Amino acid sequence: IALAAGDVSATDTVMLAPIPSNAAIVTIKLFNDDLDSGTTNTCDVGVYSESNGTFTALDDDAYASAITDLRAAVGGVGTDVTYEARNINTTGQRVWEDAGQTSDPGGYLFIGLLFDAAGDTAGDLSFVIEYVVN
């Protein structure tokens, strides 16, 4: 994803991918350019629903909360953020459960980033999300 400086301002969201609501997330890895002009950028990784092009946070920090990993370039094996905020006891839990829902809404939910504090630097963000559906 090519991000403009204005895409990483405080309260901005960036959707990564739609995931079947009944899938279990195995890994969320981020690879990125330095997206911070200083040392202020923080973001959450969470679950969102979508209706008519509008995204709503179900749990905006289900996987990661206030991470600082986008402050410097990350290549190689990337940064695994799957369990930064998520308890390892939830391994195998479905995305709808990660989102705090009481039942499976069906369809797709989205994995997205919410920028808590601005980085305001343009750059690229790549990701790998591995999941299983049983």
Residue ranges with predicted function:
Residues I1-N134:
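Surface-exposed, low-hydrophobicity beta-strand/loop segments enriched in small/polar/acidic residues
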